[in-house]
């Protein structure tokens, strides 16, 4: 299956009209950025580049696609002929997956003809907006968990395709595992899961259910103890599995007090090494509220796969420069609508790091395009002496002349993004992790 029709109709009608006007093959630069962060957020985590590069490889119009477009009279015959030969031959630079961003960060720069670049708008935004929303929410949950493991468990709270993308994005942001098996197969995300309440209800007694689970999965399994009565569930779990029981799970109740009671009961029964994991519609706020409680791990569902109240990151894809006819000068272009202003010119990002290794500002460099070559590529980082400020370059090549950089793709790309996200988040000032309203973690400085 191609990915070419995962787009909006107006992308193709723009191409149709632009080819007719003679502007369709004009060299252009498009940029992806966020005008603002969702309410209560201090930073975002960009994710989805690896998935986008995969989708880009399949972005072509096959016979079935073209036949449907012709039948629906979406575009002219001339444009259908152009689409039949479509392969993205341009270049894409941008922030690497897992990088932190703030308003104005030039997350992606797409360079090509107007026609070949504009047709990617919907695919780019639908991928990055969702994945970045999940990764941004997940990063806040990781910070709130105070180093305790988190598992993504939201597959039943979103579409089947989004569930896989969400598991991937959450893992990049620091979640340790997912319940989604396809995310494990396709992206190498560690998977986990044992039993639901239905398994307990299937058996004649809670003890029978626990015994069947332990005999099948071993004493290291996690037993769900709140189907009936939690105190009795703990007692039964330890009696069946012994003091070596791996973990118990709580999915309901007043968690701050309940986990303390369960911890005390487990310890009194000699199961001092048995862990407690909690689920129950957790958010970053409820996780933070359990910081002092004896919780060993968390399972998060609805809130992480829906971006914890911000299901889209608010990213936009705007034309920022085009070349004058016949190889002339490059001209910055910008939108000036109230509330939706954009800045013209090709850009690249740099982060100012102070002498303690903390990020203090986001520098957005507007490159001079008058020489006819927009320069949105990576630059070397300016590393200062120990204890002195330094500059970290944020823009890297993702696609060059139509060829994707394989480093950022597949399970290996996911692990690179995960490692980088941990580093990038650790650079942020402490106030970036506050969950209340406030300014972005870093000021955006245009240069």
Identify what each model region corresponds to:
Residues 92:
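Segments forming glycine/polar-rich beta-alpha architectures that bind adenosine-containing cofactors
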Residues 95:
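Active-site cofactor/substrate anionic-group-binding motifs, chiefly glycine-
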Residues 1-84, 183-185, 433, 437-438, ...:
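Non-catalytic terminal segments and appended small domains
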Residues 277:
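Contiguous mid-protein beta-loop-alpha structural module that forms a pocket-lining wall or clamp
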Residues 29-31, 89, 150, 316, ...:
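A residue-level signal for beta-strand positions that form part of recognition/binding surfaces
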Residues 1-26, 36-38, 80-89, 98-272, ...:
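Buried, small/hydrophobic-residue-enriched core segments of structured protein domains
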């Amino acid at each position: 299956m191609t990915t070419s029709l995962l787009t909006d109709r107006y992308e193709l009608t723009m191409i149709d009209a632009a080819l007719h006007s003679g502007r369709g093959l004009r060299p252009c630069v498009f940029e992806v950025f966020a005008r603002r962060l969702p309410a209560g957020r201090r930073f975002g985590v960009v994710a989805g580049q690896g998935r986008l590069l995969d989708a880009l490889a399949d972005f072509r119009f096959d016979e079935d696609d073209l036949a449907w477009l012709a039948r629906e009279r979406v575009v002219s015959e001339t444009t259908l002929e152009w689409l039949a030969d479509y392969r993205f031959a341009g270049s894409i630079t941008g922030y690497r997956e897992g990088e932190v961003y703030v308003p104005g960060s030039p997350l992606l720069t797409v360079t090509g003809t107007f026609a070949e670049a504009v047709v990617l708008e919907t695919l780019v935004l639908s991928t990055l907006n969702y994945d970045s929303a999940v990764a941004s929410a997940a990063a806040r949950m990781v910070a709130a968990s105070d180093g305790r493991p988190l598992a993504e468990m939201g597959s039943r709270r979103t579409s089947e395709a989004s569930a896989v993308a969400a598991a991937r994005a959450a893992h990049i942001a620091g979640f340790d595992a997912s319940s989604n098996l396809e995310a494990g197969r396709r992206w190498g995300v560690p998977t986990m899961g044992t039993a639901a309440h239905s398994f307990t209800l299937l058996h004649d007694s809670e003890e029978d259910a626990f015994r069947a689970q332990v005999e099948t999965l071993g004493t290291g399994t996690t037993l769900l103890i709140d189907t009936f009565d939690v105190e009795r569930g703990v007692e039964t779990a330890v009696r069946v599995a012994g003091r070596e029981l791996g973990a118990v799970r709580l999915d309901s109740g007043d968690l701050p007090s309940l986990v303390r009671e369960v911890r005390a009961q487990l310890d009194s029964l000699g199961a001092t090494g048995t862990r407690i994991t909690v689920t129950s519609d957790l958010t970053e706020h409820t996780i933070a509220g359990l910081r002092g409680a004896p919780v060993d791990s968390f399972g998060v569902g609805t809130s992480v796969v829906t971006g914890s109240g911000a299901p889209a990151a608010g990213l936009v894809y705007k034309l920022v420069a085009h070349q004058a006819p016949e190889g002339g000068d490059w001209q910055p272009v910008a939108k000036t609508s109230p509330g939706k202003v954009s800045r013209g010119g090709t850009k690249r990002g740099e982060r100012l790091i102070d002498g303690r290794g903390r990020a203090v500002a986001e520098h957005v460099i507007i490159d001079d395009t008058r020489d006819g070559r927009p320069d949105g590529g990576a630059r070397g980082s300016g590393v200062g002496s120990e204890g002195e400020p330094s500059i970290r370059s944020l823009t890297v090549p993702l696609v060059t002349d139509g060829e994707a950089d394989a480093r950022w793709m597949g399970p290996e790309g996911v692990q690179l993004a995960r490692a980088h996200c941990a580093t990038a988040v650790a650079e942020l000032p402490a106030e970036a992790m506050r969950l209340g309203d406030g300014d972005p973690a870093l000021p955006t400085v245009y240069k």
